[in-house]
Amino acid sequence: MMFVTGIVLFALAILISVALHECGHMWVARRTGMKVRRYFVGFGPTLWSTRRGETEYGVKAVPLGGFCDIAGMTPVEELDPDERDRAMYKQATWKRVAVLFAGPGMNLAICLVLIYAIALVWGLPNLHPPTRAVIGETGCVAQEVSQGKLEQCTGPGPAALAGIRSGDVVVKVGDTPVSSFDEMAAAVRKSHGSVPIVVERDGTAIVTYVDIESTQRWIPNGQGGELQPATVGAIGVGAARVGPVRYGVFSAMPATFAVTGDLTVEVGKALAALPTKVGALVRAIGGGQRDPQTPISVVGASIIGGDTVDHGLWVAFWFFLAQLNLILAAINLLPLLPFDGGHIAVAVFERIRNMVRSARGKVAAAPVNYLKLLPATYVVLVLVVGYMLLTVTADLVNPIRLFQ
């Protein structure tokens, strides 16, 4: 029951985020003197609407987005006589950019507010975790039977049998110096047989010989970064866990921006990798193992939201919602039509072009002809809709689950 409740709550949270995105456009458009004709949540047939002043507000049947209709967003629109002077395309560049940025800016603001609240209530990941290969726990070596799923095992592992303890710092594996846990794990994966491992304990270097055990792990294959099963070495250790850090009202502010900055970098990497994930999504639809690194749709996001609520992980629920708002902001700022970023690019181009013409003693040119940009816009739409259908299908037939 809580799983279903979580799905509904997260879907509602996404809808509210989209509605606030459109509110951002509407509020700034009004403040800069533009006319907002309609503000609707959802698509399809209208379920309810009312008119307040010059704006019609309403709710439509399909709760998968929303829109804010601003008069004269492009020069090809038909305008009523009272709208011509207030048409968006006739306004100063800074006003147009402000209106267009306000939507993604609202999603960014939601992300910052949520992360700030998390910093105060639950705490944020440690911004300065140990960079050395600190051992957190030792145990047996379990086979990774499927991606992310380990089989049961008992007894001590190779590291424990060799005397390695929690808190030890690994500095060398065989002839390979290591300065982080990832470097240590990579060196162990390439090793076999009895290997000397140097650890630091209470400031003293200790050499111990560890019998590397062969096991199966899912690791990147080096071609697009897709995970594939491979036989590698393992010694049965885990990295030391660093708990979250709680902040005060003022100290949470820089921490919030720092975490958001890190997330922004990761979102950029994820967007750049989208084309490489098509094959993994197709295989998942065909019954293959679903790579947890593949993109998800609103459906998949809601399922993950349901998992977090079902297990009482409200901090994960809100953090995931913050990430999703950051992703919405980043996607909408892509300099491609029909995204907000595409319209911003057109406005900036017109401004630069007219500045150059003015410097040459020429009058300002006519606004960009959006009809000529329609073919490129349709290509982007087809690619976006196609990718959305692919992710929705994968999320319906083979969703990413956090606790399975």
Swiss-Prot record:
Inhibited by metal chelator o-phenanthroline. It comes from the Bacteria. It is a multi-pass membrane protein. One of its GO terms (molecular function) is metal ion binding. The chain crosses the membrane at residues 1-21, 104-124, 313-333, 373-393. Residues 121-203 form the PDZ domain. PROSITE patterns: PDZ (PS50106). GO terms for biological process: proteolysis. Its main location: membrane. The keyword Membrane applies. A probable intramembrane site-2 protease (S2P) that cleaves type-2 transmembrane proteins within their membrane-spanning domains. Cleaves PbpB (PBP3, FtsI) near 'Ala-102' and 'Ala-103' in response to oxidative stress; cleavage is inhibited by Wag31-PbpB interaction. Probably also cleaves anti-sigma factors RskA, RslA and RsmA but not RsdA. Regulated intramembrane proteolysis (RIP) occurs when an extracytoplasmic signal (possibly oxidative stress) triggers a concerted proteolytic cascade to transmit information and elicit cellular responses. The membrane-spanning regulatory substrate protein (includes anti-sigma factors RskA, RslA, RsmA, and PbpB in M.tuberculosis) is first cut extracytoplasmically (site-1 protease, S1P), then within the membrane itself (site-2 protease, S2P, this entry), while cytoplasmic proteases finish degrading the regulatory protein, liberating the effector protein (ECF sigma factors SigK, SigL and SigM). Was identified as a high-confidence drug target. This is Zinc metalloprotease Rip1. It comes from Mycobacterium tuberculosis (strain ATCC 25618 / H37Rv). The gene is rip1.
